[in-house]
Amino acid sequence: MIIKNTGTSTFIWLPVYFYNEPLNLKLVISIFELLSYILCGYILNLSIYVMSKIQLFHKNLMFLTVPLFAIWYELIIGKFITIAYRLKIVNPGVELGEHTVFWTNDPDKILEVGGSSGLELLIFGGFLQWHTIYSIVFGILAVATERTIASVYIKDYESKKRIWIPIFLIIICQVLAIFMTFIVINRKVHPIIARLPFIFLCPISFAVWLFVKNKNKTLQKEIQNPKRTRIFTLSQQCQVKENLRALRLGTRLVAVVLVYIMVCFLGIVSLTFDLIPGVCGHFVENFLFFHPIPICLTAMFSIPRWKTEFEKSYLPWKYRRNLRKIRQMSMEIEEDSIKKISLETDLYFKQLAESWI
């Protein structure tokens, strides 16, 4: 959605959509979205709980990745603000109309207003959504940087906290995310420039992935070589295993994210060039907001210990039923053992008594 302030001749670019639909239909769709977001939040909360309870990675890595998952709530706050404007819970003072294109220079598809009065909350919601998107992009680069540092400082990285590393990376990440959000929301750059972080993310992440993989594969071979001359401490061996485990998990997550980005990009392009009806924007938009479901499930089911704990938390009734079955079987086995011992004891004393006759 593009908003033009005719008073100052400035533009505001918001990643939000509005549709020409009856109010009753908007209400039904909003209720469905709300229920879906509750499900997403439930899965996300369980995933964060499992990752925090069973910490299989270095604290510096967890310090970076957990906020990447939790930042979805910022995205949803921005979405709730948009829903409030759609349902006219918040009155903007102007008729918003239909806006289903991500970017446009067509005056007929731009909302022209005399001022931003009444739209401040909507602009803030758009800011939250842009900030979330760029925080995730730069956050992924921060995680890749942390794993590179972990591979370089393999000698003592596992045994030392170095909490300044994730703090420094988060500060840099947020400075870049806020800077990009401000220039994009004020339409100070062309859409191609706005997409540059996404474009650079792929080759940089791939280069880091190759470096970390080759570095740790080489170290693993050296550790497993019985004729090696280099001495590896236990913490160094654990760090190599952790890096390789993080690579396997990261590869699956990146594959899911890339598929997600590709589908969202195709949907946005289709809406921009009117290749699909505007109402399909609901599917494209919510496809982005539902990302915790595939990403969290991929993370949870990629590591056996996380999977077990997640299933126990996500399906508590199934776990309790299985636990009752196990306890019942244990009791039956114990009872059979007691009966068997009792029979053997009775037989022993019977044979002993007969031997004295």
Curated annotation (Swiss-Prot):
Keywords: Membrane, Transmembrane, Transmembrane helix. It is found in: Membrane. Pfam families: Sre. The keyword Transferase does not apply. GO terms for cellular component: membrane. The keyword Membrane applies. It is a multi-pass membrane protein. One of its GO terms (biological process) is sensory perception of chemical stimulus. Signal peptide: none annotated. The chain crosses the membrane at residues 28-48, 61-81, 121-141, 165-185, 192-212, 253-273, 283-303. InterPro entries: 7TM_GPCR_serpentine_rcpt_Sre (IPR004151). Belongs to the nematode receptor-like protein sre family. PANTHER family: SERPENTINE RECEPTOR, CLASS E (EPSILON)-RELATED (PTHR23128:SF60). This is Serpentine receptor class epsilon-31. The gene is sre-31.
